[in-house]
Amino acid sequence: MLAVAVLAAGKGTRMKSNLPKVLQPLAGATLVERVLASARNLRPERRLLIVGHQAERVEQQLSAVDGLEFVLQQPQNGTGHAVQQLLDPLANFEGELLVLNGDVPLLRAETIDQLVSTHRSSGAQVTLLTARLDDPTGYGRVFADEQGAVSSIIEHRDCSEEQRRNNLTNAGIYCFNWTALAEVLPKLSTDNDQGELYLTDTVAMLTKAMHVEVADPDEVNGINNRQQLAQCETMLQERLRHHWMAEGVTFVDPASCTLSEGCQFGRDVVIEPQTHLRGRCQIGDESRLGPGSLIEDAELGRGVTVVMSVVREASVGDGVCIGPFAHLRPAAVIGNNCRIGNFVEVKKSTVGEASKVNHLSYIGDAELGASVNVGAGTITANYDGVNKHRTVIGDGSKTGANSVLVAPIQLGNKVTVAAGSTLTKNVPDGALALGRAKQLIKENWAGPQG
């Protein structure tokens, strides 16, 4: 059996934020959510999150995570003290305990799998993750033989000059035999410079220790300040882009684009510079996004073009052209082969197949049929100051430029609305609707003379 414990109680004072450090966002997810996800493939029987600073806020953020147990550490007195809080919740547990840090979000699932499998096959009481650093200053050094057996861990300040040449460091991630660990946890001492209980001290108390060296030291980078958060964002974005380029996606200027882990792309998608995808996005084959676009929690079909536009929580069919400077807001549903042009906003509306809203229009709380042509400057006036109302436009209808449709209103199929009309009443199929003042011409009118 396996239990996973994530240390998430720290204050993160160097972040200088009102938000708990483990809830800082990174490529569309919080730090601690990424850590929890990295161990998902192991299918642990128990998952425990050790909380402390702003515990209620952390618990609220993660309340939807199935099977996650919250354990309070109060006060926060070191990593050893944090794991001591598991003695009661895991009193009857037998198996391995994997200890992860809530502020180390780049750790790969494959690395964790290797750590746990090595621990199980070696018969060790503890297996720790290690990393070779170009500059190990300040890190505890791990001394081990060629078979991976750890003889000692010595803090940097206690190392001799020769020992400091060893750049194998402790990453602070462990897999323990829980029964063995539970016996030594009460023996931890605060006899150190910080007056805290260190989980590292348990390694010397256990009979057999092994280590697994991480292939990429960047995986175990911890985040303590905004600079490190930005560095991890850069590394994670590069990882995501490399993954999707290997799957057939083209990035014209990779470094200028950002993704979230929830994005999915078909083949031959092209992403132009300064394009950003957030949340859960589904992008169909041969679509072209950007330049200068934001797409968030949206579903786009095959062969969609989005140019300098914003698409949020919308569903877009195949072959749709969007932009430039269009805005699809939540609950916009655009049918196949539509055109949503420049300075058009669509909110909570359905636009039927092959319809065109080409210029300077607002479509809100509306239902447009197939092959509708919306003239430049057409507005669906959906709000009466208290309530929103719907506009329905039938198949094959067209509105002239600068028309206002005052909802609630329904236009039948193949209706024509004359330019400049303001309509307040329903229009039957095939009718021409005019709602404007009669044009007057006064000849020989020179106007006021100054």
Curated annotation (Swiss-Prot):
Pathway: Nucleotide-sugar biosynthesis; UDP-N-acetyl-alpha-D-glucosamine biosynthesis; N-acetyl-alpha-D-glucosamine 1-phosphate from alpha-D-glucosamine 6-phosphate (route II): step 2/2; Nucleotide-sugar biosynthesis; UDP-N-acetyl-alpha-D-glucosamine biosynthesis; UDP-N-acetyl-alpha-D-glucosamine from N-acetyl-alpha-D-glucosamine 1-phosphate: step 1/1; Bacterial outer membrane biogenesis; LPS lipid A biosynthesis. Acetyl-CoA binds at residues 376, 382-383, 419, 436. Gene3D superfamilies: Hexapeptide repeat proteins, Spore Coat Polysaccharide Biosynthesis Protein SpsA, Chain A. The active site is at 359 (proton acceptor). UDP-N-acetyl-alpha-D-glucosamine binds at residues 7-10, 21, 73, 78-79, 140, 155, 170, 224, 329, 347, 362, 373. PANTHER family: BIFUNCTIONAL PROTEIN GLMU (PTHR43584:SF3), NUCLEOTIDYL TRANSFERASE (PTHR43584). This is Bifunctional protein GlmU. The lineage of its organism: Bacteria, Bacillati, Cyanobacteriota, Cyanophyceae, Synechococcales.
